[in-house]
Structures are given as structure tokens and as C-alpha cells.
């Protein structure tokens, strides 16, 4: 049974069959032809995987992100960020990163950030003398902050799969997200120096910052409301998603008056398309995981890993490597839904903190989103600038290396992840 499930899945994936179909067909083949259970199990298990209150946050934050991009909120956020860091060498790259950090507090999606805030900024960077490769690299890597700083769609998925408190989990992403953002800014500074990018005129003054703050306060209030209400325990991340949708419509349509009916229809259509793809993957992965568990695959993995080592740090590093490698070839939500039910109990068994584990996995998945051959963010950014992944990837390597340095710091000092949770407790 295990051999059938693994071989059939990877053959279908290699043939270009969509990930949800590959998972579903492999699992159904095991049920129908190998006596893996009743056919009623197919619908039951798929519905069980998707039937989660926490997962309702996915379409809500996706819709909020699209309304933000179309409602003038993104542009004002970027103008405000420019007034703060635009004077630094490589200023537009820093604006790109800082905008992504703020946008992360609204959308929870890396791809939405790439196509939205950062995507809007790329033509301006090229016009100001930044190479296309540098522009695409910093845009792609900065968008990964969108899944680290709360609210985070992958963390919501992890919480739903593993039964972890969503509020505590998303809080754990605050310091790691800021740390990764600062690391990206440092790399951007030295790469801008290396490329000889012209420095933006002027220097830091408080006047433009105050003006930018006045112009963008409704936009800045949005992530403060979302993260603040979650942090204080007033609402759950899913309920905060409803607030994000309502506030995004209000700010874009009433305050800024830039959100049109056509934009709302576009946001609805894209949300349905994006969320539908995610949920069908989650449902199919749930069915596939149940079949693997029934066949004893989880016990074999646990026996193999624990036979190698029982040291928590070693097991943690092995788990992170598994997620990094798999995310290079599979969509991130599918990776989480497939591997978390198998690897999470092993991590708990050796004493790894579930919040630390989940946040680190999220950061590693972010790296996978910009790593070929299936890194979705890098492909979206390359498509927007009409360059190839092969041309951009060498420029992206220093950013990936900086992210791994941040991961190493978090493994060595897990308090960086747990501090916000301790403070709120």
C-alpha cells in the first residue's frame, strides 16, 4: 500500500497532473484497488480536512489583500515607507521590504504580496536604475515575510491541522518576520552598493514622515487593528479576517474613494479562485494522509528518524530540511497538509515546542516559495518583469543565505519566537 501511494503520486506529479488530482487519484486508487477502505471514506475524509473554522481565515485575508491592492491602500503605504527609508542607499529596495512587512499584517499571503504591493513597485525600481534581476530578487524574497508576520495563512493551516491555538501561533511570527525583514534590508544595502545603484536624493526629515503618516493613517490602521485584536485576545484570527474585509472595503471605497465595483468583483473572483485551489488541495491531502497513516507510513517515518537521533535539535533540523526540500517541488499548502500530521507527533515526542516548530516551518516554506523549480513567488515576480528564473536566481542566493542565518538564530534562541506569547500571557 505504501509503495503504491508514494510511487503513483510522484509519477502523476512528474507527468504534470495538478497536485490535488495527484493526491486524490493516488489515495482513491489505494481504496478502490488495494482494499484501503470504503469509498464513503473519500468524501468523508476530504470534507473533514476542509471543515475547519480556522481555515475560513484563508478566503477572508485573501479578499482583504486584493481590496487593499485595488483600493489605494498599497500606494499610500509605499509612500509612507519611502519617507522613512527612502534616503538610505538602496532606498527603493528598503521600501519594497518595509512595505511587505506592513502588508503582511493584512493579507497573510506571500503570493498576494508579490502580485500586489511589491509588484506595483517593480517598474519604478527599474526606472530608477535598479537591475531587473535585483528588483525581482528583492521583490520575491520580501514577499515571503507575508506568511511570517501575522496573520499568516500557512500558520492558520498548521493550527487547523495540529490543533494549536491560532492566536498563540501567529504571535510567534512577529519577531521572526521583523528579523527576516532587517536581514533582507542589510543584503539590499550591500547589493545596491555593489550594483552602483544611484542614491535617492535628500535625507531623512520628520516633515515628509508626518505628511506620509497623515496620508496613510487609514491604511496603517488596518494591520494595527488586525494584529492588535488578535494579540489582545479580543478576536480569533478568523474573526479578525472579517474585520479586515470590512475595513478594507470601508477604507478603499469610502475614505480613499478608489475602490470601484469592478475592483470588488475582481477581488471576489480572485479570492474564489485562490481559496478554491487551496481548499481542494487540503481536502485531497487529508485523504492521502489518512491512507498513508492507515498503511503505517507514519510509524515507519517515526522509527527511522528516532533511530537516527533522539536529540530535539537534530530532529528539528531534519524536519526543517524535509520541508525545505519538499516545498521546492510541491505547493506549500499541500506540503503542510501532507507532512504536518506525520512529522508533528514526532517533534512533540522529543520535546520540541509546537509554536517554535510551526513558526520555523513557516519561515522555511517561505524560502521554498522563492526556490526553483516550483517556487511560486519567484515565478510570479519573474513574469511581471519578463525575466527568467535562471537569470534571477544568482542574485537571490544572498537573500536566501540571510534567511537561513535568521533560521539558525531562531533554532539557537527559540525565545525570539516565544517572547510575544510569554508577554501576552
What are these regions (language model features)?
Residues 1-425:
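Alpha-helical transmembrane segments of multi-pass membrane transport proteins
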Amino acid at each position: 500500500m505504501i509503495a503504491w501511494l508514494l510511487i503513483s503520486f510522484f509519477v502523476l506529479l512528474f507527468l504534470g497532473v495538478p497536485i490535488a488530482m495527484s493526491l486524490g487519484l493516488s489515495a482513491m486508487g489505494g481504496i478502490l484497488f488495494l482494499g484501503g477502505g470504503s469509498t464513503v471514506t473519500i468524501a468523508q475524509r476530504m470534507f473533514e480536512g476542509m471543515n475547519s473554522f480556522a481555515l475560513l481565515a484563508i478566503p477572508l485575508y485573501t479578499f482583504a489583500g486584493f481590496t487593499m491592492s485595488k483600493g489605494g491602500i498599497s500606494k499610500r503605504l509605499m509612500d509612507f515607507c519611502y519617507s522613512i527609508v527612502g534616503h538610505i542607499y538602496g532606498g527603493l529596495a528598503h521600501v519594497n521590504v518595509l512595505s511587505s512587512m506592513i502588508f503582511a499584517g493584512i493579507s497573510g499571503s506571500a503570493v498576494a504580496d508579490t502580485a500586489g504591493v511589491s509588484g506595483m513597485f517593480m517598474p519604478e525600481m527599474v526606472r530608477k536604475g535598479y537591475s531587473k534581476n535585483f528588483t525581482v530578487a528583492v521583490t520575491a524574497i520580501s514577499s515571503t515575510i507575508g506568511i511570517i508576520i501575522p496573520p499568516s495563512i500557512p500558520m492558520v493551516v498548521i493550527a487547523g491541522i495540529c490543533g494549536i491555538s491560532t492566536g498563540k501561533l501567529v504571535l510567534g511570527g512577529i519577531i521572526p518576520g521583523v528579523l527576516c525583514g532587517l536581514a533582507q534590508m542589510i543584503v539590499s544595502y550591500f547589493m545596491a552598493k555593489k550594483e552602483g545603484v544611484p542614491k535617492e536624493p535628500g535625507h531623512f526629515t520628520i516633515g515628509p514622515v508626518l505628511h506620509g503618516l497623515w496620508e496613510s493613517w487609514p491604511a496603517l490602521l488596518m494591520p494595527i487593528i488586525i494584529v492588535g485584536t488578535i494579540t489582545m485576545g479580543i478576536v480569533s484570527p478568523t474573526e479578525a479576517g472579517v474585520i479586515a474585509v470590512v475595513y478594507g472595503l470601508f477604507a478603499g471605497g469610502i475614505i480613499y474613494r478608489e475602490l470601484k465595483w469592478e475592483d470588488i468583483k475582481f477581488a471576489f473572483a480572485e479570492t474564489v479562485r485562490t481559496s478554491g485551489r487551496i481548499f481542494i488541495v487540503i481536502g485531497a491531502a487529508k485523504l492521502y494522509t489518512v491512507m498513508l497513516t492507515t498503511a503505517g507510513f507514519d510509524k515507519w517515518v517515526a522509527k527511522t528518524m528516532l533511530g537516527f537521533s533522539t536529540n530535539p535539535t537534530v530532529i528539528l533540523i531534519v524536519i526543517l530540511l524535509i520541508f525545505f526540500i519538499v516545498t521546492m517541488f510541491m505547493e506549500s499548502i499541500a506540503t503542510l497538509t501532507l507532512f504536518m500530521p506525520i512529522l508533528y507527533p514526532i517533534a512533540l515526542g522529543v520535546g520540541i515546542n509546537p509554536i517554535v516548530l510551526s513558526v520555523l516551518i513557516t519561515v522555511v516554506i517561505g524560502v521554498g516559495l522563492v526556490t526553483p523549480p516550483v517556487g511560486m513567488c519567484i515565478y510570479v515576480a519573474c513574469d511581471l518583469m519578463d525575466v527568467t528564473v535562471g537569470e534571477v536566481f544568482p542574485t537571490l542566493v544572498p537573500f536566501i543565505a540571510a534567511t537561513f542565518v535568521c533560521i539558525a538564530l531562531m533554532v539557537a534562541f527559540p525565545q525570539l519566537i516565544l517572547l510575544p506569547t510569554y508577554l501576552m500571557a
